[in-house]
A protein has these predicted regions:
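Mid-domain alpha/beta scaffold segments of enzyme catalytic cores
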Residues: 1-254
Length: 254
């Protein structure tokens, strides 16, 4: 059993072949799919996905940092409304993204901190999006750290030191296609990180692993990431799959 801890299965890129794509994933051994939220415009398609695959799909709720704009308080109200009326398995994806634009830096910080507090109140894990913002994300995590806070640093692409810092905040590292890239860098030090801190993800339809880089990603390709971790850790395919799936259960509680 392999767990994809971060996949956008509701993406319009899967519109034409979603059932076939899901079957390919299951044939490859990927049987658990955790679905991050972006903003209110995606809620309906996420709920439909859960209805279509009730035994396979586990939803998160949250406001993505690139969706934080002038109306972010309305978006946060939408997140809270849904958290109050339905079961979700994490709050995410949340965090900070300064790659595209720093206009709403303060608002991103506020949204991140607010959603972390909701997660702690509800004893839910968080799923962190961090792009060009490690210092800013760590600053918020430092101010909010507690025994009740746990989660995943989605699509981790930092340094060894940043990996250790993320782990110190009770975060697992979400490892996906980037680990297979020649210039991905994280594969150079992953063997220094205990496998108990690692979970698997695709971030599909983005960041397809080698040899599919540049193409649409899908959950079936997670086996390529497992193969890479087999090389790095010297364990069997089944051992990597079992350990990382157990790690995901430790985070999500299911």
């Amino acid at each position: 059993m392999i767990t994809d801890t971060h996949t956008h299965l509701y993406s319009s890129q899967f519109k034409e072949d979603q059932p076939a794509m899901m079957q390919r994933a299951k044939d490859a051994g990927v049987t658990r799919f955790f679905i991050p939220a972006i903003d209110s415009t995606y809620t309906d398609v996420m709920l439909q996905l859960e209805e279509d695959y009730p035994k396979d799909v586990f939803l998160m709720m949250g406001l993505h940092p690139t969706s934080v704009g002038e109306n972010y308080l309305e978006e946060l109200a939408h997140v809270k409304e849904w958290l109050d009326k339905k079961k979700f398995y994490a709050i995410g994806e949340i965090g900070m993204d300064l790659y595209w634009d720093k206009t709403f830096l303060t608002q991103q910080q506020d949204a991140f901190r607010t959603q972390i507090q909701w997660a702690k109140e509800r004893k839910l894990p968080i799923n962190i999006h961090c792009r060009d913002a490690f210092d800013e994300v760590f600053e918020v995590l430092e101010s909010e750290k507690s025994d009740d806070l746990r989660g995943i640093f989605h699509c981790f692409t930092g340094t060894l030191e940043q990996a250790k810092q993320a782990i110190s905040y009770n975060m697992k590292l979400g490892i996906g296609g980037v680990a297979t890239f020649k210039n991905g860098k994280i594969d150079k030090f992953l063997n220094e990180i205990d496998l108990k801190h690692i979970v698997l993800e695709t971030d599909a339809p983005y960041l397809a692993p080698t040899p599919y880089r540049g193409k649409r990603n899908e959950s079936a390709y997670l086996t390529n990431v497992v193969d890479k971790l087999v090389d790095i850790y010297g364990l069997s395919f089944d051992e990597i799959a079992a350990i990382t799936t157990q790690n995901s259960k430790d985070v999500f509680g299911i």
